[in-house]
């Protein structure tokens, strides 16, 4: 198993010391041998999952090379679901409002793919990164047909993705320390390795107005710039240590803003000078995770740790915030701007919610996600005024018609 995948899956299973405390039952020995030998964190064993979610987690492990015999997969899933069930979480709030939505959801072909980020391509297709299956996927929502593409580097951990002007799909290889490019017409991949091996986890990519690719690298605490014409990569370090740069947007003036998920700050960077400026949020407990931008260049962010929606106006420095409808444990996550509103999902409610915040009235509207959502890590607006979502924990992608 590759080291980066082992580190990522470390959050899924308990330390070897917990082997002595695992309950008896069919599947215990397989879990003990296949899981506890690698993984040290016990977070998810402590919190628990439902059976469908455990099935997805086990298939993510299989994609990463976990030695679970095929005839034992169902037994392992049953064992985990029985002994480590999902614990109560906040109920999804129901707030009425003026908008109407229709959800269309599709299960992706490869079990345990963990769709991480979606992309609404210009041709109407929906792309996604299969983070734990090491692939990119393309869905034709008109037919429901999928096509999967696998980069040359196995288990590269495709994470964020973006389309260039020529229709190529660029993506971050979060486990391989690289940026990838796919030409969908030919299926040909090109990979660009980080010049510094310490930058192992490029995260969110985004093009500037001149076709230069910018990206965050979370654990490495860097911001990167890649020139597609030459392949040259420039890296700069975020001033605050362990700040964990995460989501990213670009303004009409070609200035990039990004969240610093490891601290209570936002930041901006000039792609020409690579100079970074940080902006401290009022509450020290804030941990902004994803970010969205309005046509007027006003920044919104999901305050994941506190259950708030935040607003920052770079023009005057003013900051505002609103409690998310699901409460302090709602875990606001993936977000975007669409039709005069900020849209985002609450990952901490069951089921996950789709939330609409009307910028004119400052009122919320919510909908439960039919499949449960399974943590919507990112979403994107389509050119025709709808939304696409990646639903990691339920192994689905979604198109939300907004009426």
Model regions and ranges:
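Beta-rich, blade/repeat-based domains predominating
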Residues: 111-123, 154-166, 197-210, 241-259, ...
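A short helix->beta-strand "capping" segment at the edge of beta-propeller domains
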Residues: 94-112
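The canonical Cys-X-X-Cys-His
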Residues: 31-42, 76, 80
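C-terminal capping alpha-helices of c-type cytochrome domains
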Residues: 64-93, 124
